[in-house]
Structure formats: C-alpha cells, structure tokens
Amino acid sequence: MYHKRIKEAIEAIKQGEMIIIMDDEDRENEGDLVMAGIFSSPQKINFMAQEARGLICVSITQELAQKLDLPPMVQKNDSNHETAFTISIDAKEAKTGISAFERDMTIRLMCESNTKPSDFVRPGHIFPLIAKEGGVLVRTGHTEASVDICRLAGVAPISVICEIMKKDGTMAGRGDKFLLDFASQHHLKILYVSDIIQYRLNFENLLREITRESAVFMGVECEKITFIDHLEREHIVFGFPHKGSSSNEPKPLIRFHNVRSDLELLQNAQEWNALLKSIECLKEKGGYLVFLNTHSEYANSSKTCGDIKDFGIGAQILKRLGIEDFVLLSSCGGSKGEYNALSGFNLHLVEKIEV
C-alpha cells in the first residue's frame, strides 16, 4: 500500500499540488500540509493560512541555510523536538511581509538560484526549518519528510509546510478523523513519514559495518560492533550475552546513549545514573547498548532526553542487527507511541522501561 501512496504523492508534488504528511499509518496523529516551494503562489499560501491555520514554514537543506546566511533561531534548542528553526525572514521588497502575496514573494525568492542573503530582512514572517542531512533515515520529522518528498519528485528540496489545526484551534489527536476528512474534502493525498522511510530503505543505506569483535566492557565479555554512517561518524554497539533460557532472545533490551564528552556526562547526574542502571540491567538480562555519535550541535546539553524523532541511525542499527521487536530502556518519560514512524524501519517497540 505504501508504494501506491508514495507514487501518488510524488506525482502530486510534481504537479504543484499539496499533500498531507502524517507520521504513521498505524495511528491517528497530527498532520502537515506540504507543497514544493517552487510551486508556491499567493492563493496556495492563503489556503494554508485559512484552512490549515498553523505556522507557515519553509523546510530547506543545510546547504541552502548556509548560502542564505540563515543561522539557528537560538543557540541552545530546548524545544520538545529540537525543530531546527532558523531566524525568520521577509523579502527585502516586502512591505509588512505578512500578506499571502508577500509571504509567497519571500518563499519564491528562497527558491531562486541567484538569491543572496542581502535580498532578505530579518526577522520576518517566513520561518525556515533546516532538515537533517540524510532526511527521514536520520530524523523522522515532518521537516525531513517534506524535503525528501521534493527530492523524490525531482524538484528543488525546498518545501512549504504548515500544521493543520481544527476550527476550534486544537490539533487533531489520536482517534480523531479530522485529517482524513480534511484530505477528502480538499482532494489531498495523504503520505506517512513511514512510507518515505520504507521507500528509501529499498534503495539507500546510510550505514556500513566496519568491525565486529569480542571485547570486555564493564567487566563483561561482549560483542563489539562498529558502524560508520553517511557523515563518517562512528557508532559503537556492545552486545551483552542473553541470560535467559533461549540463546535467541526475541525481544532484546536496547539502550541508546548519545556520545558526549566525559566531563559533560559526569556533570549530568541524572543521565549518568540512568546509563549505569541500564548497564546493570543489560548485564543481568542481556541486550544491546548502542552508543550513537549523533548528538545535535544545537541541543541543550542539560537535557537528558533528546528529540524522540532523531533516532533514524539507531533504528537502522537495529535493522542491521536483525532486530524487529525490542524493549527500550529509557530515562525519558512519555509513552512508547511517541516514537514516530517506527514501522517504516520494520521495528516494533514492545515495551518502554524507565531507568
């Protein structure tokens, strides 16, 4: 089914139409209205403002952000999902910048190849978002999904994106048919982040295994596996022997840990204690400790919980280990349902255990 959805979404984007992007087919969730930036028009921007009602943003690549001199909005991003907002902008020729015509002017200017940083004023009424390199295979966010679908459609990787709100100002929640009805009413195709993940995994691989060896870790004989990603960053996995009745544990314990400096880790007592508790649990029951070298340079180092969408490399590591069902050892609150688009990686989070 995902093949049909992604084919229809690609064709819609090519034709300048809008689509709705949601997280996962298996659950009702919030959705964003998305179109390719090169097909922006005042009428489409007005439709987003009137019908979708959310914040109109433009998802771009890191390369374009650098070209247009768009630095992060803040140096320490402590929003829930670490959405990579840059400083907001308006076209220099705009008067107020807020009208649909002037927001469209700003967006189209961003899409032109000869545009310079001096063509904009800051702050403004258009909010650029920087997609992570590697797209949804690194971060399963709508920012990355909207850039990825433009790439797949063969158009410039610049997308206009707007959250869809209900008329009463609330977001559509789980079990709410609002987004499906909205799509039907406006003849819009629905695409899931998990669809893009599955599609891209058929053709792409951001990881390669470079070593697999025996090693002693924290006094335990483990299997040490080292992977390297598309950005030449190394990620290390320690496999603790299973202590149960079967040598093939079907639902292994998994602990992800972002690599940071020793001093930074020691200064964060909560994270240090959670790591030690996880290691003791893995020693007792077996499983995998995955050290991810993906910590965001803009993240607030005081946070113990990173972006729950920012687990794409970890998910690909689990796939390479042959894991489908797993139990997560986590120091973060929240439900296991918060982990977006896991089905795209053919993964199932059976249980989440707080440590």
Curated annotation (Swiss-Prot):
Binding sites annotated in the UniProt record for Mg(2+) 2: 28, 142
Record GO terms (molecular function): 3,4-dihydroxy-2-butanone-4-phosphate synthase activity; GTP cyclohydrolase II activity; magnesium ion binding; manganese ion binding
InterPro entries: DHBP_synth_RibB-like_a/b_dom, DHBP_synthase_RibB, GTP_cyclohydro_II, RibA-like_sf
Originating species: Helicobacter hepaticus (strain ATCC 51449 / 3B1)
UniProt keyword Mitochondrion present: no
Biological process, per Gene Ontology: riboflavin biosynthetic process
Protein name (record): 3,4-dihydroxy-2-butanone 4-phosphate synthase
Keywords (A to Z) from UniProt: Lyase, Magnesium, Manganese, Metal-binding, Riboflavin biosynthesis
NCBIfam families xref list: PRK09314.1, ribB
